[in-house]
A protein has these predicted regions:
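Fe(II)/2-oxoglutarate oxygenase catalytic core
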Residues: 1-5, 19, 36-246, 251-286
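Structural signature of tandem alpha-helical TPR/SEL1-like repeats
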Residues: 28-36
Length: 286
């Protein structure tokens, strides 16, 4: 049995190294190193790392208990680490193209049910009002057209389960993890919506200009009514099953805005809707 130790600073540093190794943030992507760092972080007392190891090894009830603050009496981190089937986690699912103009595709099982529940659990206590970007004012602000809440995940707040989901996004799109912005978990209560909008702008001189080549949306639950993602220009709507995904290119092949990608999150009429949103930019060199 491993002897657990407590060193918060070292535990946080090891967890940070795990995420860096998984996300190509500096050194080349190295999943073995990522899991090694995660195990060390768990051994040093990181509850988040402990919960991640439990979940990745299939011990999901324990993972949620740890995430909620439960203590683990022994130290099974090495055993959990050795039982993780990384190849299964990273195996990319098939993609189905549903539109060539604009370019839209769907994925049936991008995230497991358990990963969806994990992401919701991590986001729920950290939700805040969503904002829109005002191109004229060059800043983010609250807007009448967007009434939902959101939880951003900058790198210090990410975990290896989220990193694996993003790696699967990279696999099915052919895009780089390094080109991805920080992901956001979106939450819609009854009546909340996001009015028709574009995810990128035509004006490269805008103060907040970000060339978002592709938008990737993952349904984290499906036990609600309404809330479809709607494309009013082409007359299409999508509501994915739990773990399913939709992605579309915001730009034409020449890089200009594809105005057919105007889309909206329709109001939820019953229950609550959870979704992961991932914007991806152009390839990053180096």
């Amino acid at each position: 049995m491993e002897q657990a130790t407590q060193s918060p600073a070292e535990a946080d540093a090891a967890h940070h190294m795990a995420i860096k190794a998984a996300e190509e943030a500096g050194p080349p992507q190295d999943w073995t190193a990522a899991l090694d760092h995660l195990q060390r972080s768990a051994h040093l007392g990181s509850r988040l790392a402990q919960a991640e190891l439990a979940g990745l090894s299939g011990q999901w009830p324990l993972a949620h208990d740890i995430l909620a603050g439960a203590a683990v009496q022994d130290s099974p981190w090495s055993r959990f680490r050795s039982s993780i089937d990384l190849a299964k986690w990273l195996h990319p699912p098939p993609v189905s193209n549903i539109s060539e103009g604009p370019r839209i595709a769907v994925v049936k099982d991008l995230a497991t049910t358990e990963a969806c529940d994990w992401l919701i659990a991590r986001a729920r206590p950290r939700l805040k009002p969503a904002q829109i970007y005002d191109e004229k004012e060059g800043r983010h602000r609250s807007g009448d057209g967007r009434t939902n809440t959101v939880c951003p995940f900058p790198q210090p707040d990410r975990d290896l389960i989220l990193a694996i989901v993003r790696a699967r996004v990279a696999s099915v799109t052919g895009m780089q993890v390094r080109a991805m912005e920080s992901p956001h978990i979106l939450h819609y209560s009854e009546g909340e919506e996001f009015a028709p909008h574009f995810d990128t702008t035509e004006n490269p001189n805008s103060p907040g200009f970000r060339p978002r080549v592709l938008t990737f949306l993952i349904s984290l639950n499906d036990d609600y009514e309404g809330g479809e993602t709607e494309f009013p220009v082409i007359g299409g709507r999508w509501k994915g099953r739990k773990g399913g995904a939709l992605f579309f290119w915001n730009v034409e092949p020449d890089g200009t805005l594809d105005r057919r990608t105007l889309h909206a999150g329709r109001p939820v009429t019953r229950g609550e809707k959870w979704m992961l949103s991932q914007w991806i930019g152009p390839p990053v060199e180096g």
